[in-house]
């Protein structure tokens, strides 16, 4: 009997029990979160257990150390060294294999000329033509069954000028080498192609060149390995459809990591990056984009090095790609379901997949069936007289308290914008915590104040039903979004799970009422809508403890009579909190509204008073023996809280550093933080008003700490620096001044840092800082001259870029006025690999250029002076990008054809000055080597001393990356 009493006491709906259960729930969620983020570090292969895997990892780590020894962008000589090392490793691995073939684009002098939309800005209408000389290394492993559609594995070996490329994309490259080594030993059933491609960073050009190779016809599937962060776990960033997601599910059994929230965020352009997967997808391939994704403030900086990553991160990508490639290479694939997929993993133990279209159908079923069932049960309970009547005040307090929490949250967010808008960059936990605690604390205060003056007998059940209604509305809206996006909003699945579990909890409550015993006596209104003068001190205390769950005796989830008898131990006060009423037994209506004071029980009418108190007492006792709340709690709180918290963490973990990329991203992150904190709070709001004073005190304390951290702590530290973009621009048409451009977020961050540089502090150098678009700030000053070339004389920067016009028939009398104009240019640039030509006409709205020709002199064919590549565009060409491999080949030979104004608009105008058909050509050439030296007059000097100065003297709370494809840009302009 004692044990039974203890058991009942533990399960009763009390403040302490609820608070303890909340503590346990959030403790478990925290432990699961830590387990999820740390487990992969403990799963490295051991030599005695998995010798082959251990060898693959150790060899890959050694390869990574070698290829990340220096910066190796496409525009550098180090890029060739990495290419040569990879080619050597590929030849070592393939050896004399009878089914392996190697193709080197550099040796075969493969080049392409093609029209390309800006891959990093889909909204751009700038027409671009790109010429690219490739040094991709391709390996073909012919499968046992070559009729099977082949699999491509791809990674790029170039880095940015400011990063060693350990994560982006050294780990992908060495993982490809490990996969190649594995599949050489275990011949695949289907043909595998490995593409070690070059120049992904500035146009996804290596991937584009792949489709100029005959082997591209052999492959249908692709695994792209990428790094858009700097370490951590490699996530399934995106996948083609439900079939490919299920293939990942079936193959990656150890440490799967993926979430379709990333996919939706990436396609929605919340992340301003792109990977080679885009090119493969646009060319009809299906597959998997596996990438590192955080932290973005170290991405493309000097900290993208082997020092800031680990073998655990490398093994996670290597092992994931190995499991996936081995499965695809050896199994027949079911690829029938090509609808977008919703997918997620559970702490790296289990991977779940559902078609977004199927999810939409289930949403429709939920939306249709749930209100029908709920309304039906409500009508049954009304008919059986088991439904409790509630006033409008009772029904509105939960949504109004939620609305008030949102309003207060909005006011707090305004304070963040005013005082510390970039706080998310340092630590998104504090603002999320502040938003979350503020919402639940506001709800607690308002509901309990309302209950103090106007007690509500069944607040929990009302709140659960209202939560169901709110979530039904949200699900309706998100289902519409899912349908209108052609099922590409694949990150909305958490709301479907939350709605389903909340619906079950609400239906169970309504079912209990519908199946309750019919009663003739109605207890009247359980929620008092007016304040009574009669109220004892003990009763007020009990009301504060919560009268919200006065269950009817007929409730299927209430205790037995035995339980009710044992309630005496609880010492529940029997004094009414409101006026005594005589209850009409047939209709449940009050027959007296007489008010009483402390003397009333001694006077006439005391019998009526005692009857009311007795009824009230019995009802209040039932509150403490209500065990249904545990079922409702377990349905609504643990699973939805974990899924919603994990989803918000996924979003913030990927996006929090994007606040450095502009004000739009800042508002996006702030909005996600606000909405996410509300979603995390929703599962506990129906219960939270019931927590004890310790819990609410800790909540208030956590809010104060979180708000202080959010508003007052500086957003940038050594470990979470502000990423700043650098370039040094020399415009030959305006002199030889080497103007340094430093681009970063507004907020008085850049100028104080620049003013402390020695070259500025001890000179009269002026810094000009101006606001540019999207909340960014550009600071410019004249920096130290770069030393791009080794020379024995004075460095003449104007000799770096020279433009020679070989032919121009614009003013030729032999050309008809209706005939296109043709010009031929020779662009002489020293030790260079990349230039851009931009075309513009002062007299025509659109670029009149219709045809571009590139004359290429091949080393392997000296008998052919030039090989021409030509491309035409009826809509006009705005830009020509040039990329060549040979540093010793100092010229680009270009042909340009453009329409005269007469052909484009049909107007015949007098052109006395002969300028209406002029074509302005702006030339920009790029150099990306900075961590090296030139020899000037016998003395070794650094190539870009202005950048060295920033690296050496800027505080550690700053990190630096390139603004454009080179660190030094030399510009010139001519008119044709």
Curated annotation (Swiss-Prot):
Residue ranges with Basic and acidic residues bias: 582-601
Cytoplasmic side: 1-15, 381-392, 450-461, 518-627, 690-692
Cofactors, names only: Zn(2+)
Keywords: Glycoprotein, Hydrolase, Membrane, Metal-binding, Metalloprotease, Protease, Transmembrane, Transmembrane helix, Vacuole, Zinc
A GO biological-process term: proteolysis
Pfam families, A to Z: Peptidase_M28 (PF04389), PFF1_C (PF22250), PFF1_TM (PF22251)
Annotated Low complexity bias: 559-570
TM helices/strands, residue ranges: 16-36, 360-380, 393-412, 429-449, 462-482, 497-517, 628-648, 669-689, 693-713
Binding residues for Zn(2+) 2: 168, 201, 300
Residues engaged in binding Zn(2+) 1: 156, 168, 226
Compositionally skewed regions (Polar residues) per UniProt: 549-558
Membrane-topology descriptor: Multi-pass membrane protein
Function description: May be involved in vacuolar sorting and osmoregulation.
The protein's name: Vacuolar membrane protease
Organism this protein belongs to: Saccharomyces cerevisiae (strain JAY291) (Baker's yeast)
